[in-house]
Amino acid sequence: SNIANRDRGLPRSILTTLLNDPDTGAPIAFLSANALSATRTGAIPAVGAKYLAKKEAKTVALIGAGVIGRACLNALLVVLKEAEQIKVYDLNQEAAQEYCRELTQEYGIPARAVGSVEEAVRDSDVINVATAGAVSPQIEDEWLKDGVLLTLPASAGLSENTMQTSTIVVDNWKMYEAYAQELRDMPGGFSANLSGICGYLMDLVYSGKLNQEDVINLGDVIAGNRPGRVSQSQRIIFIMDGMAVEDLAWGYTVYENACKMGIGTKLNLWERGK
């Protein structure tokens, strides 16, 4: 990722995926992965909402209306069948207003651009944060209504009280434990290398301010091993750091579909037997 790419007329991130045969190691597909990554990143908050949002969630808020944010909202609207209102906050207000016009036309749901993070958060049933940059949007505890689902594919500033009084769900806690071990081995140690919402969560857990047993894996909710939403007033925060297996699964699906449709270019990497 290189923010200076924008000045060069390029995407901030230029992503690729290489799929290999698991038996031989031979490459089977080389994919441009910007759209692939955005789609899978957007899908994960929606999977969370399917299992964690209130059934009658009516107001959806999007903080950050870039490529990832739009992918998240597209997926969320697939599962939030009762959505009646969309609020969008973005630093680029003109772009947010144009996006809201597109949303209303495409989905038939009233969408409006709002002027602050607070306005987006207050009275919203599902809130997705997908901002970029060094400064994360600050979300105050009193802005979050009872029963809210806050999905975080990106970081947000949350108080310790917000974290301690909400149900915390993650994509894969074992992955966070592996990150923690890597951080301990880095110069400066664990605390010096923490960043983002995932680092904040790990710091709260390892400092004893949150009980690790109270952090729930989304997979356990889906499998029925742990409860997700148990009341309409329960506030839930779904934190995700992204897993490569998601790119792999979606990338292979795209590859299979491309083969069926005859899309793509065959590359001759070597002569047979050489």
Cite the ranges covered by each PLM segment.
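Short acidic low-complexity segments
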Residues: I109-D123, I139
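Adenosine-phosphate binding glycine-rich loop
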Residues: T162-G273
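N-terminal ligand-binding/catalytic initiation module
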Residues: S1-A38, I44-A46, E56, I216, ...
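Glycine-rich Rossmann-fold phosphate-binding loop(s) that bind the pyrophosphate
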Residues: A65-G66
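Rossmann-fold NAD(P) dinucleotide-binding segment
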Residues: R122-D123, A134-L149, A154, E160
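Short helix-loop-beta connector
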Residues: L52-T59, E82-A83, K145-D146
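NAD(P)-binding Rossmann-fold cofactor-contacting core
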Residues: V79-E106
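N-terminal Rossmann-fold NAD(P) dinucleotide-binding loop
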Residues: G69-R70
